[in-house]
């Protein structure tokens, strides 16, 4: 489990390092006012970038348990840990929903 946490941190660093460059190439590629050869060149540069530099490569993991399943994006916690924190009144403003 510790290996997955280290791997995820490494992927985050790679993503933030190449994020601006990837956005620049993508904006050039999607700009329809530019000639096609410039847009194709930008597409080639994006393909040359490492696939681990994209946001899709990063796995969402729980902040507390490092669990990779059922992680809620708003809290960055798995549903199990979030349920425990809510039941112990550690999270303000969140209540159990009853019909």
From Swiss-Prot:
Any one Gene Ontology cellular component term annotated for this protein: mitochondrion
Cross-referenced Pfam families: Ribosomal_S14
Matching entries from SUPFAM superfamilies are given as: Glucocorticoid receptor-like (DNA-binding domain)
Q: Which cysteines are joined by disulfide bonds?
A: none
One of the protein's GO biological processes: translation
Record keyword Ribonucleoprotein present: yes
A GO molecular function annotation here is: structural constituent of ribosome
Q: In the UniProt record, does the keyword RNA-binding occur?
A: no
The record's comment on protein family reads: Belongs to the universal ribosomal protein uS14 family.
**What's the name of the protein?**
Small ribosomal subunit protein uS14m
Organism (species):
Acanthamoeba castellanii
The organism's taxonomic lineage, starting at the top: Eukaryota, Amoebozoa, Discosea, Longamoebia, Centramoebida
Q: Which gene encodes it?
A: RPS14
């Amino acid at each position: 489990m510790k290996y997955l946490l280290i791997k995820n941190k490494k992927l985050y660093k790679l993503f933030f390092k190449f994020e601006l460059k990837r956005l620049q190439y993508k904006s050039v590629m999607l700009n329809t006012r530019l000639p096609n050869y410039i847009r194709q060149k930008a597409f080639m540069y994006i393909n040359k970038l490492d696939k681990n530099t994209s946001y899709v490569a990063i796995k969402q993991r729980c902040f507390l348990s490092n669990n990779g399943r059922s992680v809620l994006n708003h809290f960055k916690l798995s549903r199990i840990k979030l349920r425990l924190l809510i039941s112990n009144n550690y999270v303000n403003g969140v209540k159990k929903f009853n019909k």
